[in-house]
Amino acid sequence: MAASQSGRASSPLDTFPRLLLNHAAVRGDRPATREKYLGIWQTWTWSQVAEEVRAMACGLAELGFKRGDNLAIIGDNRPRLYWAMCAAQMLGGVPVPLYQDAVATEMAFVLTDGEIRFAIVEDQEQVDKMLEIKDQCPSLQHILYDDPRGMRHYTQTCLQGLDEVIAMGKVHDKNQPDFIVGEIAKGRTEDVAVMLYTSGTTGKPKGVC
């Protein structure tokens, strides 16, 4: 059974967001994610991860991300990019990871085919790719970046730092604590968990759910 906001079991553990909240309730102080950054191991507990994912999901909701939307995620294997996948799932959205070394023109097809409105990217390199093809992707409205280095002089209104989105989400979650719980409760086992696009070596890439 999944844990409710108060930590009590309330629903089956049949979706990733419910599993995350359950882990935060029953083993909140245990390590959930570790990453070596600049030679030093960084550790996040289950409670910390759940808090970050909730805040990210609420921030996305504030920007208009909703059930059925696809979320492009582009970058190296970093904790926040994995958390973004679960944040999309909390809202009933579908994460669409893209290969970070793909050139911009290859990404354009996926963004258009997947009708992507939101993209969470790692850094300036990926932002530049998104801006290069934005005119080819009419649905793309929000480009959210994790690493702010090099972004100071970018003025495009479609850009926003992920830190800002998470901060906005924390306020949203504090003011409306039942919102994300309700969204998670809407999740079903038959919901699409992730969409992966094929390489396209024998034709156009295809989204596989």
Positions of predicted regions on the chain:
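Hydrophobic/aromatic ligand-binding patch that stacks against planar heteroaromatic rings
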Residues: 87, 207
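Conserved pre-ATP/AMP-binding loop-to-beta segment of ANL
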Residues: 28-31, 160-166, 170-197, 204
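Conserved AMP-binding/adenylate-forming core of the ANL superfamily
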Residues: 32-78, 82-86, 103-108, 161-166
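Structural core segment of the AMP-binding/adenylate-forming
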Residues: 21, 58, 62, 90-168, ...
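AMP-dependent adenylate-forming
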Residues: 19-44, 150-151
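Conserved S/T- and glycine-rich ATP-binding loop of Class I adenylate-forming
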Residues: 71, 88, 119, 192, ...
